[in-house]
Amino acid sequence: MPALATGSACDTGLYELLAALPAQLQPHVDSQEDLTFLWDMFGEKSLHSLVKIHEKLHYYEKQSPVPILHGAAALADDLADELQNKPPNSEIRELLKLLSKPNVKALLSVHDTVAQKSYDPVLPPMPDDIDDEEDSVKIIRLVKNREPLGATIKKDEQTGAITVARIMRGGAADRSGLIHVGDELREVNGIPVEDKRPEEIIQILSQSQGAITFKIIPSTKEEIPSKEGKIFIKALFDYDPKEDKAIPCKEAGLSFRKGDILQIMSQDDATWWQAKHEGDTNPRAGLIPSKHFQERRLALRRPEIVVQPLKLSNRKSSGFRRSFRLSRKDKKTNKSMYECKKSEQYDTADVPTYEEVTPYRRQTHDKYRLVVLVGPVGVGLNELKRKLLMSDTQHYGVTVPHTTRARRSQESDGVEYIFISKHLFETDVQNNKFIEYGEYKNNYYGTSIDSVRSVLAKNKVCLLDVQPHTVKHLRTLEFKPYVIFIKPPSIERLRETRKNAKIISSRDDQGTAKPFTEEDFQEMIKSAQIMESQYGHLFDKIIINDDLTVAFNELKTTFDKLETDAHWVPVSWLHS
């Protein structure tokens, strides 16, 4: 806080005025007693002290110190919650102890009260004996500075009255506690609003700075205080309120990107929730479409779309299935577990909206999270996985695929493949024991759920690459998968960096390598775009494989953080 000035020319002038007043008033005073009273009053030390205090406060108001934030207490609570998820050490324990002290909490609360100017007197409740037929008018004066008022209004189509539609959490109106949903607005700064449209009233409010005076008729409906705990959601789509024609007030909207974590501040409105970005120190909330409303309008907008597992072209594609032998040109090869029995689950993926999440940090006794790698053919996913395995064979592991193909002389059961009969394979398929499977040259190949469990049971990080539509079924409490999408660079960079590289061919069973073609590059880009468009909301991390070394280092850093830092995961994974 800036120090107050100790004196000014204005102070001296006022003191001289006080000293001169008795002499100036003497001709108008009838008795010596009255004159003595005036001399005593204007010479009183307490009066001079009050004048001095007035001058100091006047000087302080001119300085207008602006608080850095209005929600220090809430920020301290959020910090304490965040520290609870950090590995404990002496400094963290000391800080948590400090933040939990009552005097520190009280200090932060007082700071917020002053910063929010919430010290104005609150009007007493309306008397019980008031005449029901007589409207009780309330005059409210708010100081909003340059921030929005934090309330939306609407016009009642039947009565024509202008009423408060919603109060934005953390805004000036909410902090004042004087304006409530349903209050009828009669005047703004002395201007009657009965015959005005909401847009005109908003214009009046936007042009008003400093103090705003409202004349309102309080709503007779009693508000029920919200008792919601902290709710966090992960946004599964991009949103710009300026492009949304349905939002009641574009200025009150909150924009976000796919993958952003939002804190829900209010779900009172079934259509429009109030939220803010997680970690944002600004206490004001913004409007976002509710989950039900967003799902409904997206479903109505795209009724003709039926989500199907990702399919690539039927040309001779490059490469086998990565986790097991699989020709991409066979239309009936690529199947995922539950595809037949639970195909309706794909419908939900067509309209991704929000997912409730919570922080999760792996404890030392927990199994490692399953790492799922997704990417188009030729992007370098196999090479990245190979480099990871070579970097630490004791820490990383991969699944051994099952097959019905006959074992060759140089192969060992359980090393290259787990060899089983066709009957047993088909039985396991019926029992949903495969994550995904396919058929190649009349032989089945597949990755089983038990093979993933086997790697995790060895206290290793299981590296699994699958088709993107399979990811949905792996997102369970047991595996807690972390999904990484390996994305190709631009087609110009592909031409430049992959011109001498080769891709595995599917023309023979030996996996012959052949140079990349222009068609391979175009197919890679197209496939990546489809994957990101349809399944991007399931990806936790996107790594562009422009340079293999750079991509590998980024992947390694991501894994290190995954094992030590807290990450947002679906609530169902921890509360099932």
From Swiss-Prot:
Residues 139-220 form the PDZ domain. Keywords: Cell junction, Cell membrane, Cytoplasm, Membrane, Phosphoprotein, Repeat, SH3 domain, Tight junction. SMART domains: GuKc (SM00072), L27 (SM00569), PDZ (SM00228), SH3 (SM00326). The phospho-regulated basic and hydrophobic (PRBH) motif is sufficient and important for interaction with phospholipids permitting cortical localization. Phosphorylation of the PRBH motif by aPKC inhibits the association of the protein with the cortical membrane. InterPro entries: GK/Ca_channel_bsu (IPR008145), Guanylate_kin-like_dom (IPR008144), Guanylate_kinase_CS (IPR020590), L27_C (IPR014775), L27_dom (IPR004172), L27_dom_sf (IPR036892), MAGUK (IPR050716), MPP7_SH3 (IPR035599). Residues 368-560 form the Guanylate kinase-like domain. The modification Phosphoserine is found at residue 409. It is found in: Membrane; Lateral cell membrane; Cell junction, Tight junction; Cell junction, Adherens junction. The keyword Protease does not apply. Heterodimer; able to heterodimerize via its C-terminal L27 domain with LIN7A, LIN7B and LIN7C. Forms a tripartite complex composed of DLG1, MPP7 and LIN7 (LIN7A or LIN7C). Interacts with DLG1 via its N-terminal L27 domain. Interacts with PALS1 and PATJ. Phosphorylated by aPKC which promotes dissociation from the cell cortex. Residues 10-65, 67-122 form the L27 domain. Its main location: membrane. It comes from Rattus norvegicus. One of its GO terms (molecular function) is protein domain specific binding. GO terms for cellular component: adherens junction; bicellular tight junction; cell cortex; cell-cell junction; lateral plasma membrane; MPP7-DLG1-LIN7 complex; plasma membrane. CDD domains: GMPK (cd00071), PDZ_MPP3-MPP4-MPP7-like (cd06799), SH3_MPP7 (cd12033). This is MAGUK p55 subfamily member 7. One of its GO terms (biological process) is bicellular tight junction assembly. Acts as an important adapter that promotes epithelial cell polarity and tight junction formation via its interaction with DLG1. Involved in the assembly of protein complexes at sites of cell-cell contact. Belongs to the MAGUK family. Residues 289-383 are annotated as: Phospho-regulated basic and hydrophobic (PRBH) motif. It is a peripheral membrane protein. Residues 228-298 form the SH3 domain. PROSITE patterns: GUANYLATE_KINASE_1, GUANYLATE_KINASE_2, L27, PDZ, SH3.
